[in-house]
Amino acid sequence: MAGDGQDVRTYDVELTTLLGKRSGSLGVRLSGECFSGVLRLMKQENPVQGQLSPDGQCRLTGSIRTRMGAYPFEGEGHLLPECLEMILRCGGFPLPLRGNRREE
């Protein structure tokens, strides 16, 4: 979005869980050092928010909704223009989240 200082990105992601890998997407809207977005997994839309440093290190929070309930998480890792790699800590379990930016 030219002129408003925001950058919109969509990543195709894979979350590694205790029950296997789950594919989805992460859409983010960056504004300065903050971002918000939606993590789409298991047919659910999960709002997320976080902070991003100039070198790509990030922290994010949100929750993952399933048929069984909602599971809050905190994550950290790297959110780069071309890819992302993070660890989400959910219920004491580390869940790797990796992905590549979708061509738009």
Where are these regions (language model features)?
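Central antiparallel beta-sheet cores of small beta-barrel/beta-sandwich binding domains
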Residues: 2-104
